[in-house]
């Protein structure tokens, strides 16, 4: 077996900790010791070896103990894992099932494990070319199998596709193991004292890495379905309190949401938290500060805030601050005023970061903006269907940023920079200001630039809006952006909640919004 599977085997079998899984139907937490989870993984491996020994296994479903076990089960059987999301609310079951199986086939996955309603939906369509197995059956055969050695990948991870078509990153067992070890080393994970709590989806790199890093450490982990969080976001705080969690992770919008409506919070204890990772989307310094201040009466230590940087191409984490420092904000002053950016820490062990400015690399702490390039032991082997990348080469991320005294600062995506009248404007700065307007939905704002041929040339802000007075909200938004960003939007487009296109991981697809606006002209 791979070193990744071997190390996880030793950690899970020796662990005294538990995997606690929330049953969304009953709202009860089910306890599963990590050795039990590994036993289920061995059963899954035996099932896979009895069914054509697939090179890759697809997983779809809620984050049950069986699904978590199936990840290690696939690795014990020498197979790669690819996890895809379930249907969103309002989706057509047949179209979702067809699209999911088509995506699996497109990346070479011909064996899929699922359970419950997801399994029934997948089996309701034409499954030619795909073996669909019942995960509940596969995990409970009470059998074990001799682990299979494999030189193949461990994970076929979909990328976000927020600025283009999504691709599939090929992650080797060594890359995954290096990233998990680097993350645990940076935050100092200790199975004897730490408890993790997560609602992040396992098909997303941050959600998968959080679960696997806990398994690698043998640390207790409380795992809730993402749908349980979206149905009632403030339950997250109750889960943190009930579990005595010391570690959690979420994208920026979740912290903003809690901080914005903190008056709803009562009778929780967040005093144990020492690591609250913030990643997956741009960090709002003001919103994160508001969260920390609002949670302070409930024992939250602002030093636990860890705004971080990562991407699927590097397995997950690239830079993470040292716990205890808290949010560091770097101020940049230009012609439009002062702007705050979160400092995202230094590279985790095994990774390197540099800033490319044309034909040369910017020096450390030079604060010169350029494209962020990375390399290291956590890097992907390449994109599926494309040439492998040289592990010694620097990988251009497409993100713009600079290196400050406290580490990496990310300014935005190179493809999304708005150039107007000789100025470069990062859309996230405009979006954070626009989101402060009453009625504008948190995390549902897109700022983009349109060309001279558009009927609305210049800066356009599109936002999901729910409120009684669009006219006043539009005027306030324009005034705020003009005052704080130094540019006047040429147009503000309000759309109904849920209208802006997103990726499967929930990131806004800015280029898709641009195309839809151009088509409407």
From Swiss-Prot:
The lineage of its organism: Bacteria, Bacillati, Actinomycetota, Actinomycetes, Mycobacteriales. The keyword Ribosomal protein does not apply. Keywords: ATP-binding, Ligase, Nucleotide-binding. The keyword Hydrolase does not apply. InterPro entries: AMP-bd_C_sf, AMP-binding_CS, AMP-dep_synth/lig_dom, ANL_N_sf, FAAL/FAAC. Its EC number is 6.2.1.20, 6.2.1.47. Activates lipidic moieties required for mycobactin biosynthesis. Converts medium- to long-chain aliphatic fatty acids into acyl adenylate, which is further transferred on to the phosphopantetheine arm of the carrier protein MbtL. CDD domains: FAAL. Gene3D superfamilies: 3.30.300.30, N-terminal domain of ligase-like. Disruption phenotype: Disruption of the gene decreases growth in the liver, but not in the lungs or spleen. Pathway: Siderophore biosynthesis; mycobactin biosynthesis. Pfam families: AMP-binding. Induction: Induced by iron starvation conditions. Transcriptionally repressed by IdeR and iron. The gene is mbtM. It catalyses: a long-chain fatty acid + holo-[ACP] + ATP = a long-chain fatty acyl-[ACP] + AMP + diphosphate; a medium-chain fatty acid + holo-[ACP] + ATP = a medium-chain fatty acyl-[ACP] + AMP + diphosphate; dodecanoate + holo-[ACP] + ATP = dodecanoyl-[ACP] + AMP + diphosphate; dodecanoate + ATP + H(+) = dodecanoyl-AMP + diphosphate. GO terms for biological process: biological process involved in interaction with host; fatty acid biosynthetic process. Belongs to the ATP-dependent AMP-binding enzyme family. This is Medium/long-chain-fatty-acid--[acyl-carrier-protein] ligase MbtM. One of its GO terms (molecular function) is ATP binding.
């Amino acid at each position: 077996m791979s070193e990744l599977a071997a190390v996880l085997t030793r950690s899970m079998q020796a662990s005294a900790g538990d995997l606690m899984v929330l049953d969304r139907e009953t709202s009860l937490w089910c306890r599963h010791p990590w050795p039990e989870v590994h036993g289920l993984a061995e059963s899954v491996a035996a099932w896979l070896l009895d069914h054509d020994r697939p090179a890759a296994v697809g997983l779809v479903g809620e984050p049950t103990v069986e699904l978590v076990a199936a990840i290690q089960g696939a690795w014990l059987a020498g197979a790669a894992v690819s996890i895809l999301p379930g249907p969103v609310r309002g989706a057509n079951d047949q179209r979702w099932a067809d699209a999911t199986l088509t995506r699996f086939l497109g990346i070479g996955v011909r064996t899929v494990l699922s359970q419950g309603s997801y399994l029934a939906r997948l089996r309701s369509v034409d499954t030619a070319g795909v073996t669909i197995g019942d995960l509940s059956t596969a995990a409970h055969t009470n059998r074990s199998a001799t682990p299979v050695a494999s030189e193949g990948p461990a994970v076929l991870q979909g990328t976000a596709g927020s600025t283009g078509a999504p691709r599939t990153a090929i992650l080797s067992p060594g890359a995954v193991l290096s990233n998990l070890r680097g993350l645990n080393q940076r935050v100092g994970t200790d199975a004897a004292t730490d408890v993790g709590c997560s609602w992040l989806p396992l098909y997303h790199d941050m959600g998968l890495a959080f679960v696997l890093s806990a398994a690698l450490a043998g640390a207790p982990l409380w795992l809730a379905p993402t749908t349980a969080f979206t149905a009632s976001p403030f339950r997250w705080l109750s889960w943190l309190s009930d579990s005595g969690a010391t570690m959690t992770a979420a994208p920026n919008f979740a912290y903003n949401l809690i901080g914005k409506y903190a008056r709803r919070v009562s009778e929780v204890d967040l005093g144990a938290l020492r690591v609250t990772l913030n990643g997956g989307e741009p960090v709002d310094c003001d919103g994160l500060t508001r969260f920390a201040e609002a949670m302070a009466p409930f024992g939250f230590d602002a030093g636990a805030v860890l705004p971080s940087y990562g991407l699927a191409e590097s397995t997950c984490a690239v830079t993470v601050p040292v716990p205890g420092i808290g949010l560091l904000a770097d101020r940049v002053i230009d012609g439009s005023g002062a702007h705050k950016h979160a400092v995202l820490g230094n590279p985790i062990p095994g990774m390197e970061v540099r800033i490319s400015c044309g034909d040369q690399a910017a020096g450390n702490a030079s604060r010169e903006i350029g494209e962020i390039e990375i390399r290291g032991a956590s890097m992907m082997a390449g994109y599926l269907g494309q040439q492998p990348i040289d592990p010694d080469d620097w990988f251009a991320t497409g993100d713009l940023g600079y290196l400050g005294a406290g580490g990496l600062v990310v300014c935005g995506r190179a493809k999304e920079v708005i150039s107007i009248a000789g100025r470069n404007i990062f859309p996230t700065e405009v979006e954070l200001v626009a989101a402060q307007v009453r009625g504008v939905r948190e995390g549902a704002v897109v700022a983009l630039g349109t060309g001279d041929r558009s009927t609305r040339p210049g800066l356009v802000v599109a936002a999901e809006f729910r409120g009684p007075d669009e006219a006043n909200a539009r005027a306030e938004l324009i005034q705020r952006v003009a005052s704080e960003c130094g540019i006047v939007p040429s147009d503000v487009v309000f759309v109904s909640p849920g209208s802006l296109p997103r990726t499967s991981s929930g990131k806004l697809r800015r280029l898709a919004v641009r195309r839809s606006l151009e088509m409407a002209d």
